[in-house]
């Protein structure tokens, strides 16, 4: 029966994988719904205060670029060929051979440079033109051939064109998408969890599918009780920090994180899914690798380490078991549990796996940085070639002996190794950090320029164009079955209680990596959601002519901000009423949908603006003269933060002005008021 369950779990997992490749959006069981266009008023202020509304910030975001491009191609009343030219340059940079680059560069020169030169409409500098002409005439077509144009294209777009974009519906749509992104609160309900694919010291790893996009991920779940039992809280939090550091920027050679969230019992990392097994497994199945095969893996791992070191992260646990293969055979570095940020302070702890740890890591109290990873790389490459660590002769398991050899023994390399390989390994396995390859100030560049990698096109490596020496079997789960992986003994943690102070440790644990979320959305549901939203907004406008006119009411007035909020209402104070609010320097106005009559509350009548909670939801509490209260709730985190800030600032400024104003200005004004009794007290029929 257990065998049948394992087979069914494998089949379900493989089917989910296949469907996620062909039509991930079709597999989505939840729907992403964009907020109404009126969200723009709040989101524009929210983003502007965080310096997120600049040309560079929007243009360099995936969704921002697509909306800006759509605006330039379809909505602006003038031709904007620069955007297409920019896209062509980006595609050109991905080309991996000189012949293709030469052909494409000539086509681009004819289409975007020569044609404009002939018609005297070329907007770019003479230096940029001459740079391209000079290199083309010599057939020097590097990936950076058009780089001067990238800078000038961006400069030409950031002025009037960007300002027009900011005034367009496409910027409104950008605000709608950003509101969704900044209001993500993940739970287990947002994923379909499939079979277990691995287990570690604190928890398990599962294959999973994100419900709203259909994209497949790996979900690493750490048991909070087990973490507490092993006093691993610092390690768990450190892994989340390290993953957040290395998961920004495009690095295809690290298992990156897209999300982190937690439940009452688990800490969850949502990571790149790697289906090809690990190098330790393949070493046992395939046997040792040749120099040529090892060179392939070394080159990809070097780029992964280079990315980490650029982020000032030292990995500290490089070994075959932590190198995972994807379904095509390319590799990524996984498990950053022992990684460390050395940007401000160098680590000195002795952590890692015996047989791969650098001498300076083993010497207690000695500080180190990225140097440790280059030594570990030498140990790992030796194992791929010989089947064992250079300091683990005759399969000894004595950790002290392994450490002693690491600190004292000069590795004897086999005669069968080529001179180039011997030079590489001797450089990496230097005990003296100052003499070690990669530690002379050049970092990964020192390895890239080593004779062992002569002839390697590193752009080719980055684009994963070299054929992998080993391709994992298709249609198989390259992981042990659930029975072999095993499970934790629940008795171990039976006596462990999670207290409020334990949960407080993880209050800042949730995280969304913006660029990775946007990439996921664009690959899956972006076009479909935009199309659905366009239809919904068109239907709403046709049904209610007042919709879309909220901003018209605010224009020409001193309105600070406007948008929807929920107001606690009805005689029994149990119902949230959705109203459209306008904040002015001296008052707060609102009206219901379809209502022409405005209600208002003056700043003179407010005694304080406070944050409160009702049923675990953050709310804004306005205390009103006479002992009454006015309670508001927002539909997203950014809205709540901005409304609370703007109401507080407006109230404080109004109070300051009222204290300075002559007494006759403080006479009560007639106003249409709506109040509610304190919602946390005994309720009665008085109030709204």
UniProtKB/Swiss-Prot annotation:
* GO biological-process terms attached to the record: receptor internalization; signal transduction
Record keywords: Nucleotide-binding included? yes
Q: Ranges for the Protein kinase domain?
A: 191-453
Give the record's keywords alphabetically: ATP-binding, Cell projection, Kinase, Nucleotide-binding, Serine/threonine-protein kinase, Synapse, Transferase, Ubl conjugation
Q: Where is the RGS domain?
A: 54-175
- Which part of the chain is the PH domain? 558-652
| UniProt EC number | 2.7.11.15
Q: Where is each AGC-kinase C-terminal domain found?
A: 454-521
Q: Where is the active site?
A: 317
Where is the region N-terminal?
1-190
Q: Name one GO cellular component term.
A: presynapse
Quote the catalytic activity from the record.
Answer: [beta-adrenergic receptor] + ATP = [beta-adrenergic receptor]-phosphate + ADP + H(+)
A GO MF annotation of the entry reads: beta-adrenergic receptor kinase activity
Subunit record text: Interacts with GIT1.
Role this protein plays:
Specifically phosphorylates the agonist-occupied form of the beta-adrenergic and closely related receptors.
Which protein is depicted? Answer: G protein-coupled receptor kinase 3
User: What lineage is on file?
Assistant: Eukaryota, Metazoa, Chordata, Craniata, Vertebrata
Q: Which gene encodes it?
A: Grk3
């Amino acid at each position: 029966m257990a065998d049948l369950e394992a087979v069914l779990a494998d089949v379900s997992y493989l089917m989910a994988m296949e469907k996620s490749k062909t039509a991930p959006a079709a597999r989505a069981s939840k729907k992403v719904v964009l907020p109404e266009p009126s969200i723009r008023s709040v989101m524009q202020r929210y983003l502007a205060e965080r310096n997120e509304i600049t040309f560079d910030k929007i243009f360099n975001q995936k969704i921002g670029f697509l909306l800006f491009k759509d605006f330039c191609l379809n909505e602006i009343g003038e031709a904007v060929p620069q955007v297409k030219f920019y896209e062509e340059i980006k595609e050109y940079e991905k080309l991996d051979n000189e012949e293709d680059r030469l052909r494409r560069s000539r086509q681009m020169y004819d289409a975007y440079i020569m044609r404009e030169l002939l018609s005297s409409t070329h907007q770019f500098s003479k230096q940029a033109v001459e740079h391209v002409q000079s290199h083309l005439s010599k057939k020097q077509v590097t990936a950076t051939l058009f780089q001067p144009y990238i800078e000038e294209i961006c400069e030409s777009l950031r002025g009037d064109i960007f300002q027009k974009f900011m005034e367009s519906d496409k910027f409104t749509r950008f605000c709608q998408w950003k509101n969704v992104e900044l209001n993500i609160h993940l739970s287990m309900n947002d994923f379909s969890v499939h079979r277990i694919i691995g287990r570690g010291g604190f928890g398990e790893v599962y294959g999973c599918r994100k419900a709203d996009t259909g994209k497949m991920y790996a979900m690493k779940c750490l048991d909070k009780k087990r973490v507490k039992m092993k006093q691993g809280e610092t390690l768990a939090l450190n892994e989340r920090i390290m993953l957040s550091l290395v998961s920004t920027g495009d690095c295809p050679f690290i298992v990156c994180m897209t999300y982190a969230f937690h439940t009452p019992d688990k800490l969850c990392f949502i990571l790149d899914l790697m289906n090809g097994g690990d190098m330790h497994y393949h070493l046992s199945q395939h046997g040792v690798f040749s120099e040529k095969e090892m060179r392939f893996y070394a080159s990809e791992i070097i780029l992964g380490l280079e990315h980490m070191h650029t982020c000032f992260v030292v990995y500290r646990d490089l070994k075959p078991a932590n190198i995972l293969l994807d379904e095509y055979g390319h590799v990524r570095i996984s498990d950053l549990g022992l990684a460390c940020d050395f940007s401000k302070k160098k680590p000195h702890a002795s952590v890692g796996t015996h047989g791969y740890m650098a001498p300076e890591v083993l010497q207690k109290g000695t500080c180190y940085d990225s140097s440790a990873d280059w030594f570990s790389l030498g140990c790992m490459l030796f194992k791929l070639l010989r089947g064992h660590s250079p300091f683990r002769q005759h399969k000894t398991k004595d950790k002290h002996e392994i450490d002693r050899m690491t600190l004292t023994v000069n590795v004897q390399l086999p005669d069968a190794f080529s001179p180039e390989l011997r030079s590489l390994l001797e450089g990496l396995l230097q005990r003296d950090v100052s003499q070690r390859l990669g530690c002379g100030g050049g970092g990964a560049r020192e390895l890239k320029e080593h004779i062992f990698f002569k002839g390697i096109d590193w752009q080719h490596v980055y684009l994963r164009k070299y054929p992998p020496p080993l391709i994992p079997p298709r249609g198989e789960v390259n992981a042990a079955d659930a029975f072999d992986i095993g499970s934790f003994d629940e008795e171990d943690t039976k006596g462990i209680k999670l207290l409020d102070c334990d949960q407080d440790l993880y209050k800042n644990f949730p995280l969304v990596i913006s660029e990775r979320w946007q990439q996921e959305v664009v690959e899956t549901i972006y076009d479909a959601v935009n199309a659905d939203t366009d239809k919904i907004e068109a239907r709403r406008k046709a049904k209610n002519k007042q919709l879309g006119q909220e901003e018209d009411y605010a224009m020409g007035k001193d309105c600070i901000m406007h948008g929807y909020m929920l107001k606690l209402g009805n005689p029994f104070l149990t119902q949230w009423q959705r109203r459209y609010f306008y904040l002015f320097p001296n008052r707060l106005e609102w009206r219901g949908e379809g209502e022409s009559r405005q209600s208002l509350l003056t700043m003179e009548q407010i005694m304080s603006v406070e944050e409160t909670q009702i049923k675990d939801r953050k709310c804004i509490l306005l205390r009103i003269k006479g002992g009454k209260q006015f309670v508001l709730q927002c539909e997203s985190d950014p809205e709540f933060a901005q409304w609370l800030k703007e109401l507080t600032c407006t109230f404080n400024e109004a109070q300051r002005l009222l204290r300075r104003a002559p007494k006759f200005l403080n006479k009560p004004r007639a106003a249409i008021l709506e109040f509610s009794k304190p919602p946390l007290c005994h309720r009665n029929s008085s109030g709204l």
